[in-house]
């Protein structure tokens, strides 16, 4: 006969268990409706010219032929690089970088290079994006046997400027093995630098930051001199670099840089406003030193106006870090659900609204490493005054359990307002590219915003906020590099469901801002926003509809309304404490808590302050890291006392 349990111990255990309604919702079972349908056979059928079966890696989206439409640039590892253009007459993607020396795109093929990372941006201010390929010939780390390529459209064709005499003499062409590359306008000039995440071997191969040297360049004569400014910018570090993403993460407008690394801590380079950076990853709680990062993306998942970070760890727990503020300092908190964080051999991570329902999805592109490993898809659903609900979705045809996923991008290449998904494969098996279209949300509203730099190029790193009539403010960053080895389209894509946009605001890396109304007839279209000229300041006082929770300020821009200072007072007597939030407010009771505890979001209970858990800072407490027995004991005892007090 089994011994009976002690009733007192059972009651104690029940007290220590949180109520079921306080447990985070994780979505339960996977949603049955498939999100994606494969259209590869009709849009990009495998063939020798446009979709060869080869090892491919990074993918980027830019306007290669300068005709106003996007092309998809693919980094070929065992074959040529590809430039895929959508042919509307044929309803197909066609490679325009053909194997003909007379073609202006011939050099982009670079058949000799083992390309892995790719990015595009305007480095010289001519209004046209250059294209950078990171090659890793014959090297996993340290020194490679073939240089990277930086292509510029010059003399009516694409040419590698790293091989120009001036740059050969300067020794700026990287011979180091690396992974991701990304574009950053570090000073707000409209001219971009290229951040190179090298894979160091000991003290060989630090990260690099390549940009134009204006004093040594003569653009009228076609001379574009380059320099590596990583050391002076404060980003020259030795690490096993993996993923890179760029945007105003900590800054209000200036571009910061997040790098998730392997065999070492991540970097969060905070732009100091003068083009130099300070690594704040540890203090912000995103250093994750014991994991091995891969794909990364930036987004505002809970629509609080702050930039959050999502990334995958190689066969480790994936992270979804919400940006918080504690005592005036930035902290990130991992809210990944158990299913979301489940380890996998992840490569690319993409955050986008694939069904235009207002909520962002996160796509994990895995590689079939040693065994099958299907791709995964999650919806991150905003909840008022609470952490987002994370719901697992059915990727449909994009499941690809045997896919050797290495890269991927989103773009709307056919102009229907729905994001298309392009995945690359390789490394352990040659596979063609895959193309997918969404199955859901065809009747939902959408808006696509394309900001331009002062020179007319895509304003990568710019922040776009769309104010709506019913659902508050939505934030996007114009991508300068993300995913893993990749760069998404330079568009702020907003899915709006049944809602409509009221106004849009663009903030450039130099702090310049433009706000304008969005008319009803402009819904379901593409808006281009030009860089503001000095005379545009006179137009900023035009009336704007900012939507619920926001109001137009004297400077002409929409800002959060502080309802807590309004008269009459907005909170009832039983919840007299008003807390202003982004686009809203909440009311809670005036609850007092013992030392080491603080009121929860609605003030109904006291919860332990993270700073008191075993000496861990409140930056980012992780249950995956061991606590001492004394810490667990003090935490459990404290919870008992607080529950008893209630």
Curated annotation (Swiss-Prot):
MF-aspect GO terms: calcium ion binding
GO biological process, one term: regulation of synapse assembly
Location(s), subcellular: Secreted, Extracellular space, Extracellular matrix
Alphabetized Pfam families for the sequence: EGF_CA, FG-GAP_3, UnbV_ASPIC
InterPro entries found in the cross-reference section: Crtac1, EGF-like_Ca-bd_dom, EGF_Ca-bd_CS, FG-GAP, Integrin_alpha_N, NOTCH1_EGF-like, UnbV_ASPIC
Stretches forming FG-GAP repeats: 47-89, 106-148, 284-334, 396-438
Record keyword Translocase present: no
Domain EGF-like intervals: 560-606
Disulfide bonds: 564-578, 571-587, 593-606
UniProt keyword annotations, A-Z: Disulfide bond, EGF-like domain, Extracellular matrix, Repeat, Secreted, Signal
Protein name: Cartilage acidic protein 1
Species whose genome carries this gene: Mus musculus (Mouse)
Gene: Crtac1
């Amino acid at each position: 006969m089994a011994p009976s349990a002690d009733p007192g111990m059972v009651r104690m255990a029940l007290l220590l268990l949180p109520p079921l309604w306080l447990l985070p919702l994780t979505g339960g079972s996977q949603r049955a409706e498939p999100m994606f349908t494969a259209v590869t056979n009709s849009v990009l059928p495998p063939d020798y010219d446009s979709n060869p079966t080869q090892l491919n890696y990074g993918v980027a989206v830019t306007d290669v032929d300068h005709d106003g439409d996007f092309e998809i640039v693919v980094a070929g590892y065992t074959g040529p690089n590809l430039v895929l253009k959508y042919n509307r007459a044929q309803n197909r993607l066609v490679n325009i970088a053909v194997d003909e020396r007379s073609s202006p795109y011939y050099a982009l093929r670079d058949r000799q290079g083992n390309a892995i990372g790719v990015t595009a941006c305007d480095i010289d201010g001519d209004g046209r994006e250059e294209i950078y390929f990171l090659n890793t010939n014959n090297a996993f780390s340290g020194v490679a046997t073939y240089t990277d390529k930086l292509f510029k459209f010059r003399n009516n064709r694409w040419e590698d400027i790293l091989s120009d005499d001036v740059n050969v003499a300067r020794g700026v062409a990287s011979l180091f093995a690396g992974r991701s590359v990304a574009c950053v306008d570090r000073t707000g000039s409209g001219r971009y630098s290229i951040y190179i995440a090298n894979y160091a071997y000991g003290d060989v191969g630090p990260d690099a930051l390549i940009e134009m040297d204006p004093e040594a360049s003569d653009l009228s004569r076609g001379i574009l001199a380059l320099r590596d400014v990583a050391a002076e910018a404060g980003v020259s570090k030795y690490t096993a670099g993996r993923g890179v993403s760029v945007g105003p993460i900590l800054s209000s407008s200036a571009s910061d840089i997040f790098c998730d690394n392997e065999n070492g801590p991540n970097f969060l380079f905070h732009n100091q406003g003068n083009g130099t950076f300070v690594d704040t990853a540890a203090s912000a709680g995103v250093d994750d030193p014991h994991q091995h990062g891969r794909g990364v993306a930036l987004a505002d998942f809970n629509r609080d106006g702050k930039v959050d970070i999502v990334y995958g760890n190689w066969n480790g727990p994936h992270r979804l870090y919400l940006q918080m503020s504690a005592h005036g300092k930035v902290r990130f908190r991992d809210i990944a659900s158990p299913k979301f964080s489940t380890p996998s051999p992840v490569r690319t991570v993409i955050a986008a609204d694939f069904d235009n329902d207002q909520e962002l999805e996160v796509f994990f592109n895995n590689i079939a490493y040693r065994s099958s490993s299907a791709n995964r898809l999650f919806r991150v659903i905003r909840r008022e005054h609470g952490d987002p609900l994370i719901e697992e979705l059915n990727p449909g045809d994009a499941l690809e359990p045997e896919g050797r996923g290495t890269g991927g991008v989103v773009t709307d290449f056919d102009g229907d307002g729905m994001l298309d998904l392009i995945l690359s494969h390789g490394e352990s098996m040659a596979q063609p590219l895959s193309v997918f279209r969404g199955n859901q949300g065809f009747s939902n509203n959408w808006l696509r915003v394309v900001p331009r730099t002062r020179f007319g190029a895509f304003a990568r790193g710019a922040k776009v906020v769309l104010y709506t009539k019913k659902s508050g403010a939505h934030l996007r960053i114009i991508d300068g590099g993300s995913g893993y080895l990749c760069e998404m389209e330079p568009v702020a894509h907003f899915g709006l469901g049944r809602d409509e946009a009221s106004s849009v605001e663009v903030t450039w890396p130099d702090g310049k801002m433009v706000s304008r109304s969005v008319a009803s007839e402009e819904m379901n279209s593409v808006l281009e926003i030009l860089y503001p000229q000095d005379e545009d300041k006179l137009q900023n006082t035009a009336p704007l509809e900012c939507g619920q929770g926001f109001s137009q300020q004297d400077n002409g821009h929409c800002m959060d309304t502080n309802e807590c200072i309004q008269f009459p007072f907005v909170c009832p007597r039983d919840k007299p404490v008003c807390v202003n939030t982004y686009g809203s407010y909440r009311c809670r009771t005036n609850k007092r808590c013992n030392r080491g505890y603080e009121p929860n979001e609605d003030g109904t209970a006291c919860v332990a302050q993270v700073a008191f858990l075993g000496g861990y800072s409140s930056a980012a407490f992780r249950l995956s890291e061991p606590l001492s027995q004394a810490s667990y004991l003090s935490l459990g005892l404290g919870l008992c006392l607080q529950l008893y007090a209630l």
